[in-house]
A protein has these predicted regions:
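Chalcogenol-based redox active-site neighborhoods
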Residues: 52-220
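Alpha-helix boundary/capping motif
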Residues: 18-19, 28
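Short linear motifs in low-complexity or flexible loops
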Residues: 4, 9-14
């Protein structure tokens, strides 16, 4: 047993694949270093100074003032937009690759059954009429039937409603899945604009879910 204060690294012996053996276990250099640092910290020494290579950056928003973590990092401007497969109101797939060569605006939100989300779809429906060669896609976890009902009732004709109810990985690829909070499992409010070459040129993660996005920024 290695007691705190004893530098156990000197007892390690090189094993297969250039790993070090300590008792019945093998450690690579990074693991051995980590164990030594843990021993130093236990003895009241310095804090670990190596970054955690497996650390995942999580984006954070708020819901009525309370922090909400997203499962992953929100997509950044300048990167290639990941392809996705959503479901249209007729239950056929909608893929980003199907829209290649056109400008795409993704209006992402939690649910059509909230006033703010419904307002965003109405606003983008008006904007879409004046945006040349642009496809505006309304994305949420609502069922395709709910999307169809809303668009029929509200007279939405310039927006393509699309559902992520099949958990196809869209939320993970774009970093918009709420990992906790009252709306856990739904999509955070965001707007992503993709140019004709498939690059993200605008990415807006709305800080407060109960507030509307910046429409002007998305329309530029």
């Amino acid at each position: 047993m290695c007691l705190p204060g004893i530098g156990f690294a000197r007892f390690a012996r090189a094993g297969p694949d250039n790993k070090f053996r300590f008792g019945p276990f093998y450690y690579n250099k990074d693991s051995l270093y980590g164990l030594r640092r843990q021993s130093d910290v236990f003895r009241g020494g310095v804090e670990p100074d190596r970054p955690n290579k497996t650390h995942i950056v999580m984006s954070t928003v708020k819901f009525k003032g309370s922090p909400v973590n997203l499962a992953g990092e929100f997509i950044r401007e300048g990167v290639a937009a990941p392809d996705f497969e959503l479901v249209k109101t007729d239950l056929t797939p909608l893929r980003l690759s199907d829209l290649k060569g056109r400008r795409v605006v993704l209006n992402i939100f939690p649910s059509l059954d909230t006033g703010v989300c419904a307002a965003s779809v109405r606003r983008f429906n008006k904007l879409a009429a004046s945006l040349p060669d642009t496809v505006v896609v309304a994305v949420s976890k609502d069922l395709p039937f709910a999307h169809a009902r809303f668009c029929t009732t509200e007279g939405i004709e310039n927006v393509v409603p699309a559902s992520d109810f099949r958990a196809s990985g869209f939320d993970a690829a774009y970093g918009v899945a709420m990992a906790d909070g009252p709306l856990k499992g739904l999509l955070a409010r965001a707007v992503v604009v993709i140019d004709r070459e498939g690059k993200v040129v605008y990415a807006q993660l709305v800080p407060e879910i109960t507030e509307e996005p910046d429409y002007d920024g998305a329309a530029e």
